[in-house]
């Protein structure tokens, strides 16, 4: 289990996780929260309790791959491969499995209903004919509501070295190194990070699981030699203090690495990050 890798589906530029076990492992062991974006067709306007899939930011996805716990799956190509390799016998077998599952669920429901009837009749001292616990296998059922296992994960596990899977270099070609290093440095020290758009920053940092704690920091990353306007320093400090948080900025010093040529991505990813916190004294 410890060596198991979980697939991250790459769908139209988004990183999605469809496995509940993966969501649990990412959150518990790697402090990766993600954002649940799944909604029920019957309740398209719901915005409180969303479900799978879970969408990952580019930083979260790259962090999990760098830790060796995940790999990228090109979802479009995998589904095309599945359709091309699916035979009529596979379709028949799938329908047969769903119909068998429908029988089992219906019998279980009838059994539970009969048990309730027996309990009620015992209290009344009467007997009542019960519904038979069987169905004609030739009866037709609406199978659209019967759940089926997705095969995307199994295909991904079997074909992890296949050409149908995206190269990480292509997927993360435009990764912002400074932003990622800031993200990584905080997660590695035990923080949980969420998107910080609502507070006008890159990330919001929590000292523990976001379901149990309030966020402590508004996080922004900068290049080492990047000039930060004084107005930004004042605005960031005032905003952080106003919402009872601290504005945290930071960056990595890459001036002394590979001065004679272009810096490699591998060299940049090893750089340490320095952090600076800013508060607005006597305000808020």
Curated annotation (Swiss-Prot):
It comes from the Eukaryota. It catalyses: pretRNA = a 3'-half-tRNA molecule with a 5'-OH end + a 5'-half-tRNA molecule with a 2',3'-cyclic phosphate end + an intron with a 2',3'-cyclic phosphate and a 5'-hydroxyl terminus. Gene3D superfamilies: 3.40.1350.10. GO terms for biological process: tRNA-type intron splice site recognition and cleavage. The keyword Nucleus does not apply. The active site is at 206, 214, 245. Its EC number is 4.6.1.16. Pfam families: tRNA_int_endo. Keywords: Lyase, tRNA processing. One of its GO terms (molecular function) is lyase activity. GO terms for cellular component: tRNA-intron endonuclease complex. PANTHER family: TRNA-SPLICING ENDONUCLEASE SUBUNIT SEN34, TRNA-SPLICING ENDONUCLEASE SUBUNIT SEN34-RELATED. Heterotetramer composed of sen2, sen15, sen34 and sen54. Interacts directly with sen15. Belongs to the tRNA-intron endonuclease family. Constitutes one of the two catalytic subunit of the tRNA-splicing endonuclease complex, a complex responsible for identification and cleavage of the splice sites in pre-tRNA. It cleaves pre-tRNA at the 5'- and 3'-splice sites to release the intron. The products are an intron and two tRNA half-molecules bearing 2',3'-cyclic phosphate and 5'-OH termini. There are no conserved sequences at the splice sites, but the intron is invariably located at the same site in the gene, placing the splice sites an invariant distance from the constant structural features of the tRNA body. This is Probable tRNA-splicing endonuclease subunit sen34. It comes from Schizosaccharomyces pombe (strain 972 / ATCC 24843). The gene is sen34.
